[in-house]
Amino acid sequence: MVQQQTILNVADNSGAKKLMVIRVLGGSRKRFGKIGDIVVASVKEAIPGGNVKKGDIVKAVIVRTRKETRRDDGSYIKFDDNAGVVINNNNEPRATRIFGPVARELRARNFMKILSLAIEVI
């Protein structure tokens, strides 16, 4: 589960390294975000020469969470970190590579470009 002030690792090569969640999008009272949810975040760490700079406000989609997620078949999936991918206003990734595994639940949310760039889909 991801909420306001949560620090996310960035799982792409957009130039950002850490994001801090400002808001979970999707309703006025939506407090927690899960895999596939879109958040508004601030870049807290960035590498020099990247597409995004420290202090930028970006949109990101959550691709990994430490909190387990229940699947339709009754199994649970959880990851070692909370991670997101920086996206543009068309919900497409701003980066050209995705690092680490991503969850299969992104397919139901129509993030096909992220799934195709990912090395491993779990």
UniProtKB/Swiss-Prot annotation:
One Pfam family name is Ribosomal_L14
Q: Do the record's keywords include Cell membrane?
A: no
Q: Does the keyword Ribosomal protein apply?
A: yes
The protein's matches in NCBIfam families, at most eight in alphabetical order, are given as: rplN_bact (TIGR01067)
Write down the superkingdom of origin.
Bacteria
The GO molecular function terms of this record are: large ribosomal subunit rRNA binding; structural constituent of ribosome
> What's the stated role of this polypeptide?
Binds to 23S rRNA. Forms part of two intersubunit bridges in the 70S ribosome.
Self-association and partners: Part of the 50S ribosomal subunit. Forms a cluster with proteins L3 and L19. In the 70S ribosome, L14 and L19 interact and together make contacts with the 16S rRNA in bridges B5 and B8.
Q: InterPro entries from the entry? A: Ribosomal_uL14, Ribosomal_uL14_bac-type, Ribosomal_uL14_CS, Ribosomal_uL14_sf
- GO CC term (a single one): cytosolic large ribosomal subunit
Q: What is this protein called?
A: Large ribosomal subunit protein uL14
Enumerate the Gene3D superfamilies for this protein. Ribosomal protein L14
Keyword list, A-Z: Ribonucleoprotein, Ribosomal protein, RNA-binding, rRNA-binding
The text of the family note is: Belongs to the universal ribosomal protein uL14 family.
Q: Which residues cross the membrane?
A: none
Q: Name one GO biological process term.
A: translation
Annotated gene: rplN
